[in-house]
Amino acid sequence: MHGREAIEAHYRVAGARMAGLPVYNPALTVELLGWRAVEGVGALGVLITPWCMNLFWQPPADAELPASGERAVLSLPSGDYECTLHEDERLGRHASASLCSPMQDFPGQAEARAMAGEVLRLILAVPEAGPEPSRSGLLSRRALFRRALGGAS
């Protein structure tokens, strides 16, 4: 598992190239929030950048997954999340799922961190005991944000 600092440094370099684009929000900085190992999954966190917010997933090295550019499903107790796989010389194999882009609706880092924290809380939540939830479909980005913002799921 790569460390949070290495991942953030990689995206800071990318940020230098993005700085002049209209999608870039200069009130934000690169931060990987909640980066942690999750048993059976690998490691994950929410990556905040001035141009996007992504779920960032690093699967275990021995995971059998499709090629870079293809989609893979990250299965957590809270649901299944479709991610795009990437292969990078510095970061190795990792995947991302777009949560928000562009980031102009966030006036500052505190608001972006609050949203990222709520997303982490929701995706890492273990459902309460009861009937087995339906896993018939992937949780859409819209449904995840509706839950994060306190709406019905």
Curated annotation (Swiss-Prot):
Cleaved signal peptide residues: none
Gene3D superfamilies: [NiFe]-hydrogenase assembly chaperone, HybE
InterPro entries (UniProt xref): NiFe-hyd_HybE (IPR023994), NiFe-hyd_HybE_sf (IPR038530)
Domain of life: Bacteria
Listed NCBIfam families: hydrog_HybE
Similarity field: Belongs to the HupJ family.
Name of the protein this chain belongs to: Hydrogenase expression/formation protein HoxT
Lineage, broadest ranks: Bacteria, Pseudomonadati, Pseudomonadota, Gammaproteobacteria, Pseudomonadales
Gene: hoxT
